[in-house]
Amino acid sequence: MTFDKIKVENPIVEMDGDEMTRVIWKSIKDKLICPFLELDIKYFDLGLPHRDATDDKVTVESAEATQKYNVAIKCATITPDEARVKEFNLKSMWRSPNGTIRNILNGTVFREPIMCKNIPRLVPGWTKPICIGRHAFGDQYRATDTVIQGAGKLKLVFVPEGTDEKTEFEVYNFTGAGGVALSMYNTDESVRSFAEASMNMAYQKKWPLYLSTKNTILKKYDGRFKDIFQEVYEANWKSKYEEAGIWYEHRLIDDMAAYALKSEGGYVWACKNYDGDVQSDFLAQGFGSLGLMTSVLVCPDGKTIEAEAAHGTVTRHYRVHQKGGETSTNSIASIFAWTRGLAHRATLDNNERLLDFTEKLEAACIGAVESGKMTKDLALIIHGSKLSRDHYLNTEEFIDAVADELKARLLKAKA
């Protein structure tokens, strides 16, 4: 049966990806998006061969288009290492597309679990979601690192604009064979945007907000994060938070990691770039699976976002797929990349029909899993060593099951 397509007034940016996620991405579009929406898609192929062919210009162009149209939906992509350079015969070991996009958009990545009642959690005490906000600019991800050969002095030098009066810090006096060195940075402007985005997210959810740093060791670097967050809170959010019955608090990263493990959830955790990289995967596993995690990059303007799956390109499954074998790849996080991006488009455009559609598609995913229709990774969490083939669906069967569930929900709403 055909459905009246919902008209989406403004375009979205689509960033295609690699390997198995590229395969499921097309299936999601063909079965869950295009049959129901009249949608203007600005398409960018971020698959590794096309990034190589364009000298990675396509990645920059996709980020610039996101700034123009405010909504991007991204498939998982390969970040090449030495082995990938050989495999694809690349011109260069291109940077992480996520890193490039995040640095252009200068946003905060918020990750949150997709909770299904029948999927057991490794941390059973987590009865409420934990939303982790990762500052997606600077620190180790924009650092200059080097191998030091031999003895010598390592210095850090700052030369203020318009003057020759430089400030010099002696970092270390190397003796013997040498070692390694790293210089990294962040900006007040970016940290302030991170603070605003985190405060806003927690306020929308009516959850408390925690910022974690190691300001006892990095007194100036992490201390700056702590001070700026406090300034932003006092100036713009304190009265709103008190009214909503929520709070903001700074905690040391080690203390916060321990607290997270024993808490029940139900808060936003603002992390510096590296901490957020690590802790978001820790949270995903604790809640059940990286395949059950949403990931949205929120920009400082509050109206530009990029939604993506929180996992990689599922290379192992792709190798099986290439040989014509059966795969059972979890597409939920990729489906939620589409729903979260389209939901934001709906909010910006004041499109209630589109917003309702995204809610029904998310409910269809969760409904399918809770009715026992799931991919192998989720079935394994439930059945463990007793897992058999009839416990799970293959890649396409699962997307078909979600499509059936979605159609049933749309028809029910029509009736």
Swiss-Prot record:
Reported cofactor(s): Mg(2+); Mn(2+)
Reactions mediated catalytically: D-threo-isocitrate + NADP(+) = 2-oxoglutarate + CO2 + NADPH
Domain of life: Eukaryota
Binding site for Mn(2+): 254, 277
Similarity comment text for this entry: Belongs to the isocitrate and isopropylmalate dehydrogenases family.
Protein's UniProt keywords contain Manganese: yes
A GO-annotated cellular component: mitochondrion
Entry keywords, A to Z: Cytoplasm, Glyoxylate bypass, Magnesium, Manganese, Metal-binding, NADP, Oxidoreductase, Tricarboxylic acid cycle
InterPro entries for the chain: IsoCit/isopropylmalate_DH_CS, Isocitrate_DH_NADP, IsoPropMal-DH-like_dom
EC number: 1.1.1.42
A single BP term in Gene Ontology: isocitrate metabolic process
Keyword hit for Magnesium: yes
Annotated site (Critical for catalysis): 141, 214
Note on how the cofactor is bound: Binds 1 Mg(2+) or Mn(2+) ion per subunit.
Record lineage: Eukaryota, Viridiplantae, Streptophyta, Embryophyta, Tracheophyta
Function: May supply 2-oxoglutarate for amino acid biosynthesis and ammonia assimilation via the glutamine synthetase/glutamate synthase (GS/GOGAT) pathway.
Species per Swiss-Prot/TrEMBL record: Nicotiana tabacum (Common tobacco)
UniProt binding sites for substrate: 79, 96-102, 111, 134
MF GO annotations: isocitrate dehydrogenase (NADP+) activity; magnesium ion binding; NAD binding
Pfam families named among the record's database cross-references: Iso_dh
Binding site for NADP(+): 77-79, 84, 262, 312-317, 330
Subunit structure: Heterodimer.
Protein name: Isocitrate dehydrogenase [NADP]
Subcellular location: Cytoplasm
Broad class of the protein's primary localization: cytoplasm
